[in-house]
Amino acid sequence: MNTVSPETVQAPDDDPWADWLLHQRSAGDPVYEMRIQARVAGYIDHALQRLPQTTPTSLLDFGCGDGALGLRALQRWPSLRVVFADPSLELLRRASARAEAAGVHARCRFVQLGPRGLDDLPDASFDAVLTRSALAYVPDKPRLLAQWHRLLGAGGAISLAEPIFRDEAVAACAQRAALEHAADDDAARLLRLLHRWRAHQFPDTEQALAESCHCNFSERDLFAWAAQAGFGDLRLELHIESGPSLAPDWDRFTRHTPHPYAKSLRDVLDWECGAEERTLLEGLLRHSWEQGRIVSVERMAYLSARRP
C-alpha cells in the first residue's frame, strides 16, 4: 500500500477499472454519464444515511473510484477526514482532482491498494468505513470484512452499497441448461443468440458461477460474513428496481457494459456473431428497444453494522 500524490505518478496503460468507469459504462456519452451519476448519487446518499456513526471524523472510502462517495461524505461532515483507497492510480488521480476542485483536498489522503491490501494500516485507524460497488469484486470478502473490523475503533461503523449479480448469473446458467435440450427450430436459434450475449456478461455454468467473485454471493452472504467478522447491530436492505435503460439511444445501449469484465452487446454482435446471426439478434433487440420493452433490473444490497 502506498500513499501517493496521484498527479505526479505515471499511471499504467492497462487499467480496466478506469477504462470502464471513465468510458465504457456510459459508452463515452455525456448525457448517459450524467444519468448514471444521478443514479449513483442516490446509492451514495442512502449508504451515508444508513451509517450508524452519525458524526464520523475519520473515514475509509474503500475502492473509491473517482471519489464520488468520499467527496459526498466530506460535504456532509465538515470536520471529516477521508482516506481514498483504490488499486487504480488513474482513478485516484481523478478523485484527487475532484477534491482539489471542491476545496477539500487538505482533508484527503490517497492510498493506492497493492497486493497487501489494507495490511499496512494500523488498528483503529478509522471510525467509519464506506464502500460502494467495491466489495463485490474482492475474492476474499470475509477477510476484507475482518480487516475493516480491525481498522475501526470501538463503536466504529461500516455502511456498504453493493450490487447483487447472482440472479443474472443463475438465469444465464438456466438458459444454457435449457438450450441443451432445446429443439433445433427458430425459437431455439434465437434463444441461443440471446444466451450468447448473456454469457459474455455473466457466468453461465455452475463452476464459472462459483469462481466468479462478483456473482457467487447473495445479500445474505454479506450479512453472514459481517457477523462472522465480529460486527453487531447489523441491518440489511435489498433494493430491487426495474425500469427503462438510462441509455439515451440504441447505439449507446449496445455499447454499455454492466461491469468491467463484461462485453457489450455491440462487441457480441460484431465479433461473436455471423452476418445472418447479427441481423437476426440486432433486429429483434432494436425493435424491442424502440417499443420500450427492454427493462433494466438493478439489485443493490445495503449493509450497515457497528464494531462493538
PLM segments and residue spans:
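Class I SAM-dependent methyltransferase SAM/SAH-binding core
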Residues: 58-62, 66-118
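A short acidic, Gly/Pro-enriched loop at the edge of an enzyme's catalytic core
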Residues: 119-128
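Short alpha-helix
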Residues: 214-229
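C-terminal helical/coil "lid" or tail adjacent to the Rossmann-like core of SAM-dependent
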Residues: 8-35, 235-291
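A short SAM/SAH-binding and catalytic strip from SAM-dependent methyltransferases
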Residues: 127-140, 164
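Conserved class I S-adenosyl-L-methionine
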Residues: 1-55, 68-72, 76, 91-94, 159-196
